[in-house]
């Protein structure tokens, strides 16, 4: 009898855990006028011309379930009623460095959202493994979207910047739910990264990746798309954007990835700009390119 009860309990425990994957726990409106961003986007308490499009958007801080954890994130919705394609935005940085905040989401995705997209992004779990278990925090957003009335859970794209490129490539390796993706100045080869920036190994990799020194080669390869481009979802497509003057992510490895994708006949495009890691002097071009790609490959795709 006890064995039967234990089996029943275990069944319901697993069922509950599966059902709760990505569950939206909270959704709270962000009043932009009460945030530090307001001083940058406004003048005399009125939105500047370059940011007038923000009037058409609602911003929310969210929490959702991923594995047994509660994860923080940000959600952007058009104010206008409707059901819109969803783009998951993957932030760069690690741990508390360069977290996903209102400023970042505005800089990279607000022009896209204003044109009829729901944007959702994760701040990843506190125990950041730099491409490890926190991948679930990204993938589980495909379930969270099912609880967002304005989001179409059957029409999901992804946009990753810098370290967010690692998360995007890993997502395309582990899921067929992403119809198309964009990676901007993404990291493709962590071996090259630590050669170019040795402090990234001691201050980030060794601290974030479990058993790093013992399993270094295996763990870096697991996070480096250059070693497994053939495993990217064939159901998806990819736009890779590169800044030639990027000092943070080696763009030579990006061109090597592009060559491999070409050999594999993967559905991709590659665009290169003379700019830095943040596209500082090419923001308008970046916004237009991102919108054009998602319109063509997500919103109006056959």
Feature locations, PLM:
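C-terminal catalytic histidine-bearing segment of alpha/beta-hydrolase fold enzymes
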Residues: 91, 248, 255-302
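Short substrate-entry loop that stabilizes the transition state in hydrolases
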Residues: 82-84, 89-130
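N-terminal cap/lid segment of alpha/beta-hydrolase-fold proteins
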Residues: 35-81
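Short beta-strand/loop motif that positions the catalytic acidic residue
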Residues: 239-242, 246
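Mobile cap/lid helix-loop segments that gate and shape the active-site cleft of serine hydrolases
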Residues: 99-100, 192-231
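Short, proline-enriched alpha-helix->beta-strand connector loops that line the catalytic pocket
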Residues: 231-238, 264-266
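Catalytic nucleophile-loop/oxyanion-hole region of alpha/beta-hydrolase
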Residues: 108, 121-152, 281
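Primarily recognizes the serine-hydrolase "nucleophile elbow" in alpha/beta-hydrolase
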Residues: 140-197
